[in-house]
Amino acid sequence: MTDIAQFSTGTTWPEIATDILAIEDRHTSGAYPKRPMAIVRGEGSRVRDADGRTYLDMTSGQGVALLGHSHPRIVEAIQRQAERLITCPEIFYNDQRARLLERLAEHTPEGLTRYFLCNSGAEAVEGAMKLARMVTGRKQILAAQRGFHGRTLGALSATWNPRYRDPFLPLLPGVMHISYEDIGAAERAISASTAAVILEVIQGEGGVHPASLEFLTAVRDLCSKRGALLILDEVQTGLGRTGAWFACDAMGIQPDVLCLGKGIAGGLPMGVVCWSESLGRMKEGSHGSTLGGNPLACAAALATLDVLEEEDLPNRSHALGERLLKEFGGANHPLVREIRGRGLMIGIDLRQRVTPALKGLMTRGVLALPAGPTVLRLLPPLIVQQSELDHVRQAIFEVLEEINDGRDID
């Protein structure tokens, strides 16, 4: 990795970091709990902070850096498109958008060939919920306990965590939550009033909990019988993350609507609502997104799809994940309650709070995420090397040993 340009002329690395942290703290919204580091450069699976320290990024920027940081194909596509045309709203046609829509139709689950392009996963969920109400004429939306679908008001209504919801009550009326994996609860709840059921195939924020084939099949059948739509939120699990192009494909579950986001544009903001041709078009003027489908993001998304295809990254994710899950599972560590996940989406459920482990990993040059109070979540870029995963695995075991021995890891 090449040297990072200095933040301000004539200052040393520590002063640069202090400048960045102080400025952000002085002006930030306060919405985010921040780690005491300033990331200023990224390349592949690694990022560098303003003090010159390098870290293996097992967060992928919260799942966004699907191809790693500053992938050369993404950088080239952005530079080339930025010289031609950056923005073009959907009231006009555009070549990059047309190419992307055509390419999406080659990969999204069979029959899902209508798309609304937006800027985030939460926006995609909002669009999916509006589409469901519009198409069915019904109001009720069913979501799952422990589920996470975003923090905008509609998406937040489908999100379960009371910590996120309670300050903003009342939320969208007509949204109810059922127990994840409870077929009986689904059968009782899905009715002639239900517009849609929205689920994650693997709950991410809720602790990396995969749904069983039995549960998803039952919900799919109930939706079909009772005229409700099945919306699958694959914002985090889609595009190779779980070892298949889409997690629902690997399980043979056909959604009516699919939500995408995070890494689809290689790091630029993009979300997509995908739905079945049988549902028809949205009514003109019923929805919109000023920046959605802009040529710059579309060019980056096209480059992302190219790399996913050419390097067969979904299958690579499957192979790397299988090995990593096996290695973690075979360790039988006393602090580990359970290992869950698929592909390169892995949750290590600890018998204690996860925060000390996250801090310990940072001191060893590894960045990871929580998924609830006790789960250590790994979302490495799909281009991660086996040697890097080996290093991460070793660092995790070292940190857990220190915690188990009662040693100070700060």
Task: Give the location of each predicted region.
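Conserved N-terminal phosphate-binding loop of PLP-dependent enzymes in the Aspartate aminotransferase
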Residues: 2-410
